[in-house]
Amino acid sequence: MPKIIEAIYENGVFKPLQKVDLKEGEKAKIVLESISDKTFGILKASETEIKKVLEEIDDFWGVC
């Protein structure tokens, strides 16, 4: 059964933000979804505008 978890990408490695029930060496598929993809349609802004705002937030706070 598929399970969705959040991970952060650091130094070329995806690091899960919660415990993952996998055996050492076991393979898993990763589906990448950006924050702008997740929020598209919620805000009344174009995808380009959302990406620009997220880039500005990341530049200032380093959180995206």
From Swiss-Prot:
Xref: Gene3D superfamilies: AF2212/PG0164-like (4.10.1150.10)
Q: Which residues form a coiled coil?
A: none
Q: InterPro entries annotated for this entry?
A: AF2212-like (IPR008203), AF2212-like_dom_sf (IPR024069)
One Pfam family name is AF2212-like
Which keywords, in A-to-Z order, does the entry hold? Toxin-antitoxin system
Protein family according to the UniProt entry: Belongs to the UPF0165 family.
Q: What does this protein do?
A: Possibly the antitoxin component of a type II toxin-antitoxin (TA) system. Its cognate toxin is VapC4 (Potential).
Q: What is this protein called?
A: Putative antitoxin VapB4
Organism per entry: Archaeoglobus fulgidus (strain ATCC 49558 / DSM 4304 / JCM 9628 / NBRC 100126 / VC-16)
The gene coding this protein: vapB4
